[in-house]
Amino acid sequence: MTSVSGGSPLLRPQLYRTVTVSTILQADQQDRFLESGELSQLATYLTSGNKRLDIIITLTNNSEAIVSRAANRIFVGGSPISYLERPQSGIDAKLGTNSYVESQSGFLEGFRSLFNTGGADITPAGFKPINVSRYGITRMQKSLRDLDWFLRYITYAIVAGDPNILVTNIRGLREIIENACSSAVTLVALQEMRRASLSYFTKDASAEAIVKQYFDVVITEFLAPAPSDLVRKRTSTSLQGLKLPQIYANAVVQKPRFQMKSTLSTTEKETVIKAVYRQIFERDVRRAYSLKNYDLESKVKNGQLSIKEFVRALGKSKLYAQQFYEPFINSRALELAFRHFLGRGPGSREEVQEYFALISKGGLPLLVDALVDSKEYEEYFGEEIVPYLRTLGEEAQECRNWGAQIKLLNYSARFQKTPQFITLFAGYKNPLPDQHPYGQGNDPLEIQFGAIFPKETLQTKAAFFGKDTRRILIRRGNGIDNQLSNPSARQKSPGSFGPKVFKLSSVASLNKNTKNVSFGETSTQAIIKAVYLQIIGRETYESQRLKVWEIKLENGEISIREFVKQVAKSNLFRSLYWTPYYVCKSIEYINRRILGRPTYGRSEINKLFDIAAKKGFYALIDTLMDSPEYDESFGENTVPYERYLTPGGLALRIKRPNLSVSKEAKNELRFIELGAINESRGERSIQLRIQQGVSKRREQTKIFKLNHHDDKVNLEKVIKAVYRQVFERDMDMYRIQNEFTVFESRLKNKEISVKEFVEALGQSQLYQKEFYTPYPNTKVIELAMKHFLGRAPKNQIEIRKYNQLLASNGIAALIRSLVSSLEYAEVFGEDTVPYRRFPTFPATNFPNTEKLYNSLTKQTKTISNPSFAPEKTRRIDLLSPGA
């Protein structure tokens, strides 16, 4: 049970705290609204936002000068700032134009800083400047990088409004730096950076105070000793003893600790009692359901009953039994009781068995007594502390119940009826040896190596393997020659049952200490092709071939083994099997290509992973090529071939007799299947189907277009058509108005086009009175699109677009936008009167246009293209009939 894992869900623990997150989480954990002091704190932080950004911009723009002053203070004998490696900017600097900033304040300021310690800054004992030439390039680069990181962390903390990010990342660095150089030197550099940064804010007292505050935190935390780890207490040998680094606990927002004391006020005692209800019932049942135990609460407030006994009484209450005992089976009720009374889930199979026997024997009261009277409860909560959830960040979490515990501590745990821990621990007793140690899928595909795929889903089941599990591999060839049962058979050829083997026989050379291969051009070209196919996985392009090494192989200067090694170290192989993948998957690929088999298990992957991490890609290739297994299996002049494969890979290569191509289900969309034509149709039949649903009115539509202004009759027809289109009726009696007379005369005098005449009518007072004032905005948009584009709105996106325009700029802007649109220009142009169109695409818009045109304008105010089906309003009686 020591090597098992309860699933590995993807978690992102909190790395630092901010003002907003800390304040809101504290209120959320206590199930309350923000108090006036917290709101004031947030308001102060948000009000200072612009000033904080200005501070950060100033520090960022002068970061090199600040780091330069600090470096000049602690380094001598060179230009230390030249070793600062800055992130590559968007525009690469030209060659030969690199410049370095020594100090923005000039030589005098730098000379003054040597003798002026700033009044309050005291040079620590043991400080001695470091010689640049003796310190070395690598150390100089790391030192300048660290100084730059200190300044960068300060800018992060200023934005967050909380120095927690500095506490989390800086405390404990002194011991690490002490091993590399000197903590006194680092302290002097930080003091100089503080002095240099404050010099940019001498005219702004508030900004200077903010910068000084965060620099003081950096110096204080740097001098503080490294925090000790949080050790998880355990009361049984079956539980895992774990420890959590202090920095993780400092980064998260801690659960509030509620402790009852006799000196608390009445309001504070009420808050503690509310916390007990929230922990035991997972919500404040007093506020939600007005359920209170006045007798117990009064005894707690008067000091007659401790919090521990109050928790025990609530756990034995009828309400708790109804909520968390009666609806569940015993194993699930046990898991929920662990959450409520100990703040965690069961940690081992032995613990589940122990408490399961208690709940089976004495029911819920005996289980509650056992948990509350346990030594663990006494050590964590005592008599007066309210139990709390011991989540990630509060203490170290066990790996054996990782996924199940995270799900148990979730807010929705009480809605899960199925027990999780008992099935999880039972699964550990049934290991499946035929499984890859880094996954649960048992390699269903050859390309899925079961490595660590990051998934957002929560896996609470056990991974059915241990660290010593070995995968089953099937030999391609005689099974009796498997290298595990018969290691001496590695050199045997697989024969007709395995893959084809390419091999060159060695011949004598002038140098007796070396071996050369055959000089035949045909055979060597076949060997070269086989090497590319095995190592690269395909034939290579001409530009990707290793011509120099191919010539050496043909001339007998190198062996096939050396040629394989060079191909495996090529940029092509690296780009295919190393760069795109994480290390575990790359190791699996490379192992298959070079040794001809998948990896056996976790121990082999761990060994290769360690080599790749410490020595790099080329050392990994050398390790595999120089291994005894490669030497025994292929030797010097044999091309590597596939020797073993997984059961899943073998199953994929075998054609099953009861499966045929003709019986495979067709993966076609339903509308394609229903739309298939099984008959021959004539032209008339096709035309009828094209025009189905469209009345004869489309064919009878007359389009009015102004071709010549001199044709008075045609001009009069166009003007009347515009009035009928825009106002939906003849306007002879309204045309005598001065407003319309001006528009008509300008059209007749060729001063405006038909398009501009239409826009002028749409922006008139009469149009606003008839089609804007009486209707809601959505109906106004539909009518405007009917009058000026000849159709209804296509969808809700179009309605939202014009609704925003109408609400912000008015009806005139809406009309101008429609008439000036690309659609209007393409359909009507400058001199065509808008007319009713019959748009059949999208099909869902056609009935909306029909409904819009077939209903009289003054008949209804309903919307033709609603976003949802309208519901009838219901009448709600606020008072009961008897009231």
Curated annotation (Swiss-Prot):
It holds the Pfam family Phycobilisome. Its EC number is 4.-.-.-. Residues 238-418, 488-669, 684-861 form the PBS-linker domain. One of its GO terms (molecular function) is lyase activity. Transmembrane segments: none annotated. The keyword DNA-binding does not apply. It is an enzyme of class 4 (lyase). (2R,3E)-phycocyanobilin binds at C181. GO terms for biological process: photosynthesis. It is a peripheral membrane protein. Contains one covalently linked bilin chromophore. This protein autochromophorylates (Potential). GO terms for cellular component: cyanelle thylakoid membrane; phycobilisome. InterPro entries: Globin-like_sf (IPR009050), PBS_linker_dom (IPR001297), PBS_linker_sf (IPR038255), Phycobilisome_asu/bsu (IPR012128), Phycobilisome_asu/bsu_sf (IPR038719). Keywords: Antenna complex, Bile pigment, Chromophore, Cyanelle, Electron transport, Lyase, Membrane, Photosynthesis, Phycobilisome, Plastid, Repeat, Thylakoid, Transport. SUPFAM superfamilies: Globin-like. It is found in: Plastid, Cyanelle thylakoid membrane. The keyword Nucleotide-binding does not apply. This protein is postulated to act both as terminal energy acceptor and as a linker polypeptide that stabilizes the phycobilisome architecture. May have intrinsic bilin lyase activity. Belongs to the phycobilisome linker protein family. This is Phycobiliprotein ApcE.
